[in-house]
């Protein structure tokens, strides 16, 4: 989902202490390793993916010995070593740290869009009242699609602005009238969006 992508972009781009960065990296690798174990264990003997289990254990050692990890509360530490979390501090916190979202807007947007991808009740309880029809889409169907496209556009614009800011800061010689005009137009559009303000 594009909201996840934008959050991850800002999360990985953030200028942070080496210990925090190392912990984030180990947690991402642990999540990947645990996901792979869940995938292969249905079809393989444990001995066939022993390397993944060994890798998981090595990552757990690295996480537990990380200086930033030891500063976290016990509840957060327990969550991180499950391999179920992608973001240190959780996704909501990561999204808030991007500075791109108001918390209520993020929660509402993420909840609504993920409900459809997970076939949660919000995605089908109102089928009849919203006149859901795949031959002749209803207003509710168009509104949902428009909302998703607007969110995707806003997220891509926000990431583009962040990258352009970085690029123009690092390579000031690349500034020109076109770039200035383009960036300003993006900023104007971004500033008028209710999504992030």
Where are these regions (language model features)?
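Short, hydrophobic, well-ordered secondary-structure elements
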Residues: 1-14, 110-114, 153-161
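Long, hydrophobic, well-ordered secondary-structure blocks that form the structural core
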Residues: 1-39
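Secondary-shell segments that build the walls of catalytic and ion/ligand-binding clefts
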Residues: 29-147, 157-197
């Amino acid at each position: 989902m594009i909201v996840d992508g934008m959050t991850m972009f800002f999360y990985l781009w953030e200028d942070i202490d080496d210990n925090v960065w190392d912990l984030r990296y180990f947690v991402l690798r642990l999540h990947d390793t645990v996901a792979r174990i869940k995938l292969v264990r249905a079809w393989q003997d444990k001995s066939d993916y022993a390397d993944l289990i060994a890798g998981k254990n090595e990552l757990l050692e690295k996480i537990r010995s990380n200086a930033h990890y030891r500063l976290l509360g016990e509840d957060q530490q327990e969550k991180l070593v499950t391999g179920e979390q992608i973001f240190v501090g959780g996704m909501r916190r990561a999204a808030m740290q991007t500075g791109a979202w108001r918390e209520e807007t993020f929660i509402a947007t993420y909840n609504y869009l993920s409900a459809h991808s997970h076939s949660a009740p919000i995605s089908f309880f109102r089928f009849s009242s919203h006149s859901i029809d795949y031959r002749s889409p209803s207003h509710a169907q168009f509104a949902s699609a428009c909302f998703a496209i607007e969110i995707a556009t806003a997220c891509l614009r926000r990431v583009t602005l962040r990258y352009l800011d970085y690029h123009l800061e690092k390579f000031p010689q690349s500034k020109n009238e076109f770039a200035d005009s383009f960036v300003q137009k993006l900023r104007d559009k971004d500033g008028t969006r209710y999504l992030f303000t």
